[in-house]
């Protein structure tokens, strides 16, 4: 290891607490199977003054998904043996069920149950356990797309996997993780920490910021195969060393987890067996992040370099950015690429995606544009006045007989869609929107629209209760969004699009959706 390599890495690691301030954190870097960095700082619990160390138990959240799939592959050479078990757990589905591999690759077509729970009126910090999960999953009647044809992030895919493994083996998922993963790998402290209210060693996750102050985050979810792993930095180091030690074995677990995955049409898929597959700084990378209120983590592995990075924060800073900065330092490449100064002026405006009914807002941003479509905004580089793109999306303006449109290509989702430009001129009578709308797909869940002092508010209700009333934001004629910045899970749905539909001039229905749960029709009561 050269002096310049050591200096770059030391500088990047030393900068983490200031760049990502919060109660505490930990980082590990491994190269060629050797631990180069193993460091914790700050406090796992600031009230009790418990230090954050490499042995501190941490809530790994969605990093769990690769371990769930690892357990699946350890127990079943051919996971499709369990396809009938998936079908049995979707009793009301009116179309062919996804198979087990569709679940593992996030190609199931299901709507994410944390998002759907908000449509059912789930309180943001309310209890959500096995019973609540089962009620939401059992209510599934339709899919967002035919299994295998596209990608969408769906947490219950992995809950279904762990539940099915429990039923098939007659053993708890905690025991299965222990025998299939923890013991062989040497993850000595790792556990299934299903209850999110507390960790057994007192580690706490915190909401807030330096400006507002940090406070313990309140969570009341019970997790299993989707996000239930509790592990220390030392446990994750053991995982990364196991990956390196078994790298040349043809049937090694990580080799099986990272085998190339495709969609049903043969196009390469960016996600498989609980792992994202991408390129960073010109290298192939497998990785995943984890998040819950108060907890952020990220791990990545560059097989060609035999290089791994693990980052944990017990606060809400962007662990994925931190891990990317550490990776850039380890590779000796700049973290921030040069960006274009071209402004895609022809794209700016508000659109409605025809296929899903989701809103898309394209706004000016330094070097290009900001696209508001997913849970969080995407920064696009301006290529020309009519084109902007990022690694996962391309948007191009076009004129058709029906007017100005844009084409949005999302190769990672294996789909291309048309964005129809919306009429942003004011003028409709907002009082006509008020009323109650009901969704047959969601067991008669409702959205209530009211005018409070002349201001439009909306709220969801369903089998989990009555949700908060939120002030709606008008985007265009009959197109509004209901903000959802906080939810049961950390990665909230974001903005729910409410696209009102009229017949004979009267509002009769509203099409509701977000990227995690799309295209749900609510009829006016």
Swiss-Prot record:
It comes from the Bacteria. The keyword Hydrolase applies. GO terms for biological process: proteolysis. Its EC number is 3.4.11.19. Residues 485-495 are annotated as: Important for specificity. InterPro entries: Bact_CellWall_Synth/Modif (IPR050491), Beta-lactam-related (IPR001466), Beta-lactam/transpept-like (IPR012338), D_amino_pept/lipop_sf (IPR027279), DAP (IPR023645), DAP_B_dom (IPR012856). It catalyses: Release of an N-terminal D-amino acid from a peptide, Xaa-|-Yaa-, in which Xaa is preferably D-Ala, D-Ser or D-Thr. D-amino acid amides and methyl esters also are hydrolyzed, as is glycine amide. Inhibited by beta-lactam compounds such as 6-aminopenicillic acid, 7-aminocephalosporanic acid, benzylpenicillin and ampicillin. Inhibited by p-chloromercuribenzoate. It is an enzyme of class 3 (hydrolase). Keywords: Aminopeptidase, Hydrolase, Protease. Pfam families: Beta-lactamase, DAP_B. Gene3D superfamilies: 2.40.128.50, DD-peptidase/beta-lactamase superfamily. Substrate binds at residue 489. The keyword Protease applies. The active site is at 62 (nucleophile), 65 (proton donor/acceptor). One of its GO terms (molecular function) is aminopeptidase activity. Hydrolyzes N-terminal residues in D-amino acid-containing peptides. Homodimer. Belongs to the peptidase S12 family. This is D-aminopeptidase.
